[in-house]
């Protein structure tokens, strides 16, 4: 199953959960209203999420005059990826990490930390930036915004269902009391699992395309190894304050976080590196980035 097909199926599952929760609360009309509420939330998040996350992370915009090597690298890789030049931001944290945001390729941004520019060499940093550009090209920033909003809507509907059950609910509600209780408990959990599964799928796809953009799969593999080792040793305070943003980063930024794979926002780093190593045996047609 391709990554895009898997994402489509998981998104369909989230939509079904939203409508199912709405249906338990208010029948067919409730399902439609729940979907409309989720749609309105998605529209708001689509327009504002990039500004919100950049502000939460304390990112500041940099120009070519301030960071010529970084901005030139982003420009060269964006050209290889056939993308408009994104805005470039720097985060004032020593944890090596990076993320992309923006509602579409024309309004996108790439953010890197101070730490990543110190820890990685030139080719490794190019691999990370190429990974983030792959997210932009795939419109993963939009996908993850939608999934986060829908997961939040399901949690809200779960609370509404709890109060509806407590105070009697509708007489013609086709869901039994037991079904309502089970949905109230398990639907938000299922939504979270689906959200995390989508996040992991998009990371694999971004690794693959990022390696194609930069032309150096082993450079990206080396970057992932270095970032993963350092992420558990250096605290990223803005990310710790906003843990919902963890899935945006190339490696989970939360300090000393060990979770079951089912609940992980990112695939195991070892598996990501193994896939990149398998790619390294075939040279991209475009050749490696930065080759002279």
Swiss-Prot record:
It comes from Paracoccus denitrificans (strain Pd 1222). NCBIfam families: PRK01345.1 (NF002363), PRK03001.1 (NF002826). This is Protease HtpX homolog. Zn(2+) binds at residues 131, 135, 203. One of its GO terms (molecular function) is metalloendopeptidase activity. One of its GO terms (cellular component) is plasma membrane. Gene3D superfamilies: Metalloproteases ('zincins'), catalytic domain. The gene is htpX. Belongs to the peptidase M48B family.
């Amino acid at each position: 199953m391709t990554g895009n097909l898997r994402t489509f199926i998981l998104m369909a599952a989230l939509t079904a959960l939203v409508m199912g929760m709405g249906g338990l609360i208010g029948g067919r009309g409730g399902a439609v209203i729940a979907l409309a509420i989720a749609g309105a939330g998605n529209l708001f998040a689509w327009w504002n999420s990039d500004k919100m996350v950049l502000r939460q992370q304390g990112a500041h915009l940099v120009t070519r005059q301030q960071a010529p090597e970084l901005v030139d690298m982003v420009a060269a890789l964006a050209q290889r990826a056939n993308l408009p030049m994104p805005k470039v931001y720097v985060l004032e944290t020593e944890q090596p990490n990076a993320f992309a945001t923006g509602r579409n390729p024309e309004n996108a941004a790439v953010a890197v930390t101070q730490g990543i520019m110190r820890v990685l060499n030139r080719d490794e940093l190019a691999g990370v930036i190429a990974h983030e550009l792959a997210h932009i090209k795939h419109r993963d920033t939009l996908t993850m915004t939608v999934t986060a909003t829908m997961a939040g809507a399901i949690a809200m509907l779960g609370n509404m269902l709890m109060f509806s059950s407590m105070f009697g609910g509708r007489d013609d509600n086709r869901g039994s009391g037991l079904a309502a209780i089970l949905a109230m408990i398990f639907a938000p959990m299922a939504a979270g699992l689906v959200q995390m599964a989508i996040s992991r799928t998009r990371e694999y796809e971004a690794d693959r395309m990022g390696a194609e953009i930069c032309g150096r799969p082993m450079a990206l593999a080396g970057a992932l190894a270095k970032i993963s080792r350092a992420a558990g040793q250096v605290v990223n305070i803005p990310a710790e304050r906003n843990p919902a943003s963890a899935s945006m980063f190339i490696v989970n930024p939360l300090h000393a976080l060990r979770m079951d794979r089912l609940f992980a926002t990112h695939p195991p780093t070892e598996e990501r590196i193994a896939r990149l190593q398998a790619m390294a045996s075939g040279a991209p047609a475009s050749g490696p980035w930065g080759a002279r």
